[in-house]
A protein has these predicted regions:
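Vicinal oxygen chelate
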Residues: 1-2, 5-14, 46-50, 69-153
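Core segments of cupin and vicinal oxygen chelate
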Residues: 12-56, 60
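Hydrophobic pocket/interface hotspot
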Residues: 19, 23, 82, 99
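A short, acidic/glycine-rich surface segment
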Residues: 34, 42, 64-70, 106, ...
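Short Gly/Pro-enriched turn/cap motifs at secondary-structure boundaries
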Residues: 38, 73, 108-109
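Glycine-centered loop/turn positions within well-structured domains
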Residues: 54-56, 80, 126
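Acetyl-CoA-dependent GNAT
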Residues: 60-63, 133
Length: 153
């Protein structure tokens, strides 16, 4: 393959500080840039580093209400949700606890077979997921969405 991952995902927000705080407190993310990256003074661009080669480019645009619009799964347009990769099962557990403490996720962990997953919504309501390799996976075995992970029962 000629690629080794995603560089960034661009999102809209009505409250940059709230998103910075959330991603910093839950994921230990770091803000790399924060300011008017474009000539238009009504546009604020913030770059939040969420992983070794992954960033959220957050745009706060005066008067734009698109970040407040919520739609059901598969009705969200071309990008349905954002899935992040936890560094380890221990990091996954830490992130999961932090998400639950903030009310961003419930206690349900999905077992897809080779992958464990927890879904959450960020403060703007963006549907997101954290994934990690399943240490209990059986080779060649997959499970449908909605299968509760036994280790979190």
């Amino acid at each position: 393959m000629l690629l080794n991952g995603f560089n960034h995902v661009a999102v809209l927000t009505a409250d940059t500080e709230r998103l910075q705080e959330f991603y910093s407190e839950v994921f230990d993310a770091v803000t790399l840039r924060d300011g008017p990256e474009v000539a238009d003074a009504d546009v604020r661009m913030t770059v939040i580093h969420v992983g070794p080669s992954a960033e959220l480019n957050v745009f706060q645009i005066k008067g734009n209400t698109e970040a407040e619009r919520q739609t059901p799964m598969f009705g969200r347009g071309r990008l349905d949700h954002l899935a992040l990769q936890a560094e380890s099962i221990e990091a996954f557990d830490t992130i999961r606890e932090r998400l639950m403490a903030r009310g961003a996720a419930d206690d349900f962990v999905t077992d897809f077979g080779s992958i464990l997953s927890v879904f959450f919504r960020d403060p703007d309501g963006l549907e997101c997921e954290v994934c990690v390799a399943n240490p209990d996976a059986q080779p060649g075995v997959s499970h449908p969405p909605g299968t509760r992970a036994a280790r979190y029962s």
